A protein has these predicted regions:
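Internal helix-loop-helix
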Residues: 1-61, 102-109, 120-121, 188
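Short Ser/Thr-interspersed hydrophobic loop/turn segments at strand-loop and sheet-helix junctions
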Residues: 12-16, 113-114, 130-135, 159-163
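Short beta-alpha junctions and helix-cap segments that line functional grooves
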Residues: 49, 81, 97-99, 140-144
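A short, Trp-centered hydrophobic/proline-enriched beta-strand micro-motif
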Residues: 60-70
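Short Gly/Pro-enriched turn/cap motifs at secondary-structure boundaries
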Residues: 73-76, 100-103, 117-119, 145-152
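A structural signal for short hydrophobic beta-strand segments in well-ordered beta-sheet cores
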Residues: 83-86
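A short core secondary-structure module
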Residues: 91, 95-139
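Glycine-rich beta->alpha junctions and the first turn(s) of the following alpha-helix
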Residues: 116, 137-210
């Protein structure tokens, strides 16, 4: 708390030297979820979600977040979202599937990008704060990855999940801009992780060569 980006980069590098799984979990929670809420969330959202996310715990239990943009047919092309959030007045009705979600099973809170008005293109996307234990949220089995296996990656499905309007981040239609701005910061975490992994591998190889 209270430290700058350089301090965060140094911490990410050191953790990545010994455990890339821990660092990628940390990167998503801090670079994407916490940063997004800190910069664009309301005071109510910050108090309810950001405080325990920054602490990593709530009521003595693990409390981290996940960022949900990728879908079966929408990866780099974020405007091709198929997940929908139908405006129902005081809440949204969320339906869709998100793939390759880091912290998908271990997270308690999700930042979910969803299309609320397809006719508006990128301006019809919103970001919603969704709690994992809400009715209609289904977490699929953990992906059997080749590496960074300590980091859980899942497909997550939403079936008529009621999301309060108070859980939308920013004004209506801000979701795409939110995702792009947040991901820009997230890339700092990924770059730091890559440097740390490379440094750790070098140190191990050097020690072995002797």
């Amino acid at each position: 708390a209270g430290m700058d980006t350089i301090s965060y980069v140094l911490a990410m590098e050191e953790i990545s030297k010994v455990d890339a799984s821990v660092s990628v979990c940390m990167s998503v929670n801090n670079s994407l979820v916490c940063y997004g809420l800190q910069e664009y969330g309301t005071e109510e959202q910050k108090q309810k979600y950001l405080v325990p996310l920054a602490q990593g715990k709530k009521d003595g239990n693990l409390y981290i977040g996940a960022f949900m943009l990728s879908e079966p047919e929408a990866g780099s092309d974020a405007t091709s979202q198929r997940t929908t959030a139908e405006d129902k007045g005081d809440h949204y009705l969320l339906n869709g599937t998100k793939n390759w979600i880091t912290n998908g099973g271990s997270a308690s809170v999700y930042l979910v990008m969803a299309q609320t008005d397809a006719s508006k293109g990128s301006k019809g996307i919103n970001c919603l704060i969704v709690e994992k234990d809400w009715p209609g949220v289904v977490v699929a089995a953990k992906e059997n990855k080749m590496g960074i296996r300590g980091s859980d990656t899942h497909t997550v499905m939403f079936n008529d999940v009621k999301v309060p309007k108070a859980n939308r981040i920013g004004e209506d239609g801000f979701g795409f801009k939110f995702a792009m701005k947040t991901l820009a910061g997230g890339r700092i975490g990924i770059a730091s992780q890559a440097l740390g992994i490379a440094s750790g591998a070098y140190e191990l190889a050097l020690a072995y060569s002797k």
